[in-house]
Amino acid sequence: MPRKGPVAQRPLVKDPVYGDVLVSQLVNKILIDGKKSTAERIVYGALEQCREKTGTDPVLTLKKALDNVKPALEVRSRRVGGATYQVPVDVRPGRSTTLALRWLVTFSRQRRENSMIERLANEILDASNGLGASVKRREDIHKMAEANRAFAHYRW
């Protein structure tokens, strides 16, 4: 923890091609070993495939997918008198976006298509239609929060 008070959050940079912050965040999530040009090629290719398959703006498709994947609740472990409880808490907006992007990338890497461009494009399209592994992950998290609703009074 810094002694000089809270650290200022860096401003989010808009993407040069689509002019959207979410696209640049997605590029940074795809990034491996600092190869940003490769990550950009993958994301732009996937968004272009989304445009070809749906005929709509790919950024709108991405936003719709993220809205379907963003969690509203999550569980956090809280130790109370020797027992650990899974306490449901609300997710901050920034964290929900980060989690949604992380899940999109993680589950697109696990898909069986040939190239990463195809995998990411299909995961985005599935998520925008309410399907796919990333949407299932959100549903599982919400189910867990609902199951542990009795411990909500331990919220901090």
Curated annotation (Swiss-Prot):
One of its GO terms (biological process) is translation. GO terms for molecular function: rRNA binding; structural constituent of ribosome; tRNA binding. It comes from the Bacteria. Keywords: Ribonucleoprotein, Ribosomal protein, RNA-binding, rRNA-binding, tRNA-binding. GO terms for cellular component: small ribosomal subunit. Pfam families: Ribosomal_S7 (PF00177). NCBIfam families: rpsG_bact. One of the primary rRNA binding proteins, it binds directly to 16S rRNA where it nucleates assembly of the head domain of the 30S subunit. Is located at the subunit interface close to the decoding center, probably blocks exit of the E-site tRNA. Belongs to the universal ribosomal protein uS7 family. Part of the 30S ribosomal subunit. Contacts proteins S9 and S11. This is Small ribosomal subunit protein uS7. The gene is rpsG.
